[in-house]
Amino acid sequence: MKTILSILLLVTTFTAVLPAQREAVQFSVKSVADGDWTNPKTWQPQRLPKAGDRVLISSRTSVRFDAKTTPVIRLIQVAGTLRFARDRSTELNVCLLKVQAGNHCTERGFACDFNSLNTNGEPNAQPGKSLPTLEVGTQQNPIPAAHTARIRLHYLEGMDKKDAPALVCCSARMELHGSPLKRPWVKLGATCQPGDAKIVVNENVSDWRVGDEIIVTASKKVRNMGTYRDEEVGTEERIVKAIDGHSITLDKPLRLEHSGEGEFRSEVANLSRNVIVESADPDGVRGHTMYHRHSKGGISYARFAHLGKEGELGRYPIHFHLVGETMRGSAVLGVAVVDSHNRWVTIHGTQYLLVRDCVGYKSVGHGYFLENGSEVFNLLDRNLGVQAFNGPRLKDQELPFDPNDGAAFWWANGRNVLTRNVAVENAKYGFRYDCQKRSNFDSNLRVLMPDGSRKIVDIRTLAISRFEKNESHSEGLYSVALAGTEGVGPDLRHPHLIRDLKIWQTHYAFRAQLPTMLAENIQIDHAVYGIYRPWFENHVYRDLSIAATGSEPFNRGLDDKSMQHGSITVDGLAFSKLSYGGSMPLIQISANNVNGEAESHFRNVTVRGRDPKRPDRWPLMNLGGGPRFKPSTPKGVPYFIHDYFGPGKHAKVISSRAKDLLEDGNKYSQEKGLTGDESLATKVSGIDFPELLSPVDDLPPCT
């Protein structure tokens, strides 16, 4: 009987609490005049808001938040203006802070509460001219560096743990702006040794402050990390004790070496800001923030700490939720997102957003995340992403093929720009592009076009329009993986564009598993695999450097499937630091010529660092490791190295198993340094170096 009563009590409590979240609240305190938060005359009744209050900042009133701290307010609805003081440090403790018009408010921490909403509580009509406003500094007049403005999100009993605590902007204005930093993250200027308590960086950071939290990122690949939330890592956290231009004194010595010379250097990132939004209880119920459609404002140089609800869809530290083009001109600049349990910055059904100079440090699941594949014309520039952990799939997530396994940057629509970003020590990927068509997902989506119209298009055909000057190092498994379309891709005039990419200290460096791609100026250093599992079809590589890559520097088509779907050209390929490795080839030969027309053309290939005492090591071209295929297609793949024997005298290399090529009338033999035990070569002439692509730039600016 006690058990039955307990169950009935539990059900009664559950049904009593949750519907309450959808009921309009009665405000206990309302603003009735412009004035300071700490002035009783601002309020009706004439007293300061106290613990547990539900507070309304009434329309046509402006309240200056000047409190050094507050008790935990249950709910604040900003229908007028709540402006944080700029002449003192302030702290607001609150469970639910909603910026929205009207006097009607519920305790839902995701949905909005006014008219013109859809069934999910999302705005579908433009607001009036006067916008409710939460202003914690502005971009032109941020909170001065001498002061802090802090919003602490507390969970209170009776709130829905899936929704609260929260900071939500519903077709209103929300401005969160701290004191700018010239560079929120920089590169090391000199190598740090274990035991060093002073570091040198490559740029002046005199605007950083004593007491700031910083990280020095990993320089080595520690291990295959998996989740690695509780595993050994190479990134180290420290506190600044002193700053002198380029020199930073730490609170305690470093444990590991961190590279700071040459091409490949670790980063130093500042995690402190003077505008802070944080969960009050990181080990308890965490909070989240979001902008809804038709909102205004932006975020700069703020810290978002201990936010994100693990495993809950839509509850992220920074979330632009289905805003479409309505927030064009908004930006997230110089933000630090620290210790998130659900992403760093989520761009969901949103276009024309700028995310620049941000630092993401520790996330469960992907970090910088574009959620449903419809997002276009967003720009992610000069952001740092460190330690995105393996996370759970989210219930009802829009892209069912995404395992949420820990990428610093994850996106599914190529019409977004990623430039000058760095990914470090993430569980699975530094950068991951993935777009699949499945029985439970149709990749034909309604997408914004450059002319402003909308069109249903297979987003797998939209090229990665600009992926430039990005870097990845010390990753758990992959550095850059562009894959998933099963051979569907863009046309020859709009190839995927990958430029100026730097990858080091990783396992799989560059998974180029998309057709129709131009990749130029790619540096790979200290990887196990270089170009890995490529979908060779209209691939053009220029100026590719692969160094100290010990297993398969330039993989065959689709690796163990050994399938080449079309032709490739490689102009400028340098192999170096070959001090280890066995008899694997530098370039693996694909066995199967899927359409019968595939060819591979190489030019300006150099090899440095072979061991002269081991001529059997590192032949230039051979079948390589893994299965020894007998070709399943009638034709093999011919490989041409232009000018190998001198100007106009080319090498043609084939697999010794390709019967059709063995019978093409040429005399094949092994060539020292060029062929291995399962490849043969001959000298040919009169072979043109093909032009596979004819790229044009006919897209508008991104933001």
Show which residues each predicted segment covers.
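Bacterial N-terminal signal peptides
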Residues: 6-15
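Short glycine/acidic-rich loop motifs that flank beta-strands on beta-rich extracellular proteins
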Residues: 83, 87-88, 103-104, 281-288, ...
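A conserved hydrophobic secondary-structure block that centers on an alpha-helix together
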Residues: 194-244, 311-314, 320-346
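Acidic Gly/Asp/Thr-rich repetitive segments characteristic of extracellular carbohydrate-active
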Residues: 28-59, 204-213
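Right-handed parallel beta-helix
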Residues: 43, 273-274, 297-306, 328-341, ...
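Extracellular beta-helix/beta-solenoid repeat scaffolds
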Residues: 53-187, 206-208, 212-242, 247-291, ...
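C-terminal accessory/interaction regions of large nucleic acid-associated machines
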Residues: 544-703
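Surface-exposed or flexible loop/turn and strand-edge residues in extracellular/cell-surface modules
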Residues: 26, 32, 40, 51-52, ...
